[in-house]
Design a protein with these regions (language model features):
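N-terminal strand-loop element at the rim of the active site
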Residues: 3, 8-67, 235
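A conserved mid-protein helix/loop that constitutes part of the nucleotide-sugar donor-binding site
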Residues: 16-24, 195-221, 235-241
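Membrane-proximal helix-turn-helix segments that form the acceptor-binding/catalytic region
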Residues: 74, 128-147
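Short His-centered aromatic/hydrophobic patch
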Residues: 87-95, 113-114
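A short, active-site helix/loop in glycosyltransferases that binds the activated sugar's phosphate group
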Residues: 142-169, 176-178
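Aromatic "clamp/platform" in nucleotide-sugar-dependent glycosyltransferases that forms part
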Residues: 258, 277
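Short hydrophobic beta-strand element within catalytic cores of glycosyltransferases
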Residues: 294-298
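Conserved acidic donor-binding segment of nucleotide-sugar-dependent glycosyltransferases
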Residues: 309-322, 330-336
Length: 363
């Protein structure tokens, strides 16, 4: 008999892409008859817990972070005895390797790779992360039984970085948010766009919103009535606000913060802009095109090249080239888009396809 029991482990359910995906996959598998458990370390800034399907066994372990999680995780494994564990975090994967070692419990340890590992290594900050946490990750992360990557370029990167057997890895594209899919069953693609560009994500160095703001300030010379809306929170908010003041565009840039109504922002934007230094697989681009809004993105590692079809659903910009980013935004604003065709380009990212792939992996 097929064992359809699976446990997902993540640090929290804050407003990030990994957390969103974790809930979507857990809900989807539970709806397909799986015995699903979703375990989080803590409920800090929890955004997605209200969306968890009642069929999912949800448990909060009550520990502040991964560093202090060994005892509660060890107790959980001894008590619940999961057969398969999918972990959505580098540090947690390493911790679970040690828990398995000490507990002598046999379970399959699967890790979902959340970023382009080589780029993450290049952009480490902080003594604790750089000289202790990441060296541990670098040595022990590959001890997971299987690593799921969000796109082909991520898979290529991690196989090369760790010299892994490619059979120990797989690719499962992130699906379109289930809430967006439900929205699209009820409503037509929005054809009346409003006068703004959109950026979505954490206000942190990896997302490098400064490039988007600079490009936008130049685009204003051609489209003076345009606005830029930025959805997200983070430690660089004040620094980015200062940049808008320096560029003289602070009256044209709206820092919205976190919003639960992201569908409305995507649907009505003229375009969504992504200027990240690197990504795992940018859900922002998938969400935008699925709602019919074209995208402009740096050709960063990894993901944009596997999502964007130039002239069909948006444009790729040369990496870290703010002048080319500006040029591609202007190209997007001047083009007459078939918004339904933009949305159709997201077909390969449907939730059902992702769930099929997860089931194939887990059975």
């Amino acid at each position: 008999m097929v064992n359809k029991e699976i446990t997902f482990l993540i640090n929290s359910l804050g407003g990030g892409g990994a957390q969103n995906l974790c809930v979507n996959i857990a809900n989807g598998l539970a709806s397909r008859g799986w015995d699903v458990s979703l375990i989080v370390l803590n409920a800090k800034k929890s955004v997605f817990h209200k969306r968890i399907n009642k069929k999912v066994n949800f448990k909060i372990l009550g520990t502040s972070n991964t560093r202090y999680s060994f005892n509660v995780l060890h107790n959980y494994i001894k008590t619940e005895k999961p057969s398969k564990l999918v972990v959505f975090n580098y540090e947690l994967t390493v911790m679970m390797y040690f828990v398995r070692l000490v507990s002598l419990k046999k379970f399959i340890l699967i890790s979902r790779n959340i970023n382009t590992i080589s780029k993450k290594k290049e952009n480490l900050k902080g003594i604790w992360i750089k000289y202790f946490v990441f060296p541990l990750i670098n040595f022990f992360y590959k001890k997971a039984d299987h690593i799921v990557n969000q796109c082909k370029s991520m898979q290529d990167d991690i196989v090369k970085h760790y010299k892994l057997d490619v059979k120990k890895t797989s690719v499962i594209y992130n699906p379109v948010n289930g809430i967006i899919e439900k929205h699209l069953l009820k409503y037509e693609i929005e054809s009346k766009k409003e006068g703004y560009l959109l950026c979505v994500g954490r206000l942190e160095s990896q997302k490098s919103f400064n490039y988007s703001i600079i490009a936008f300030s130049n685009v204003l010379k051609i489209f003076p009535n345009l606005r830029l809306k930025i959805l997200g929170e983070g430690s660089l908010k004040n620094e980015l606000i200062d940049l808008t003041i320096t560029l003289g565009v602070n009256d044209k840039v709206d820092f919205i913060g976190f919003s639960s109504d992201v569908i409305s922002y995507y649907s009505k934007a003229k375009a969504t802009i992504l200027s990240s230094l690197y990504e795992g697989f940018p859900n922002v681009l998938i969400e935008s095109i699925s709602l019919g809004t074209p995208v402009v993105s740096f050709d960063c590692k990894s993901g944009p090249r596997e999502i964007i079809e130039n002239g069909i659903n948006g444009y790729l910009s040369n990496y870290l080239d703010v002048n080319d980013l500006e040029a591609k935004i202007l190209l997007t604003l001047n083009k007459r888009w078939n918004y339904k065709s933009v949305a159709e380009s997201a077909h390969k990212f449907k939730l059902d396809l992702a769930l099929n792939n997860w089931e194939t992996l887990l059975i």
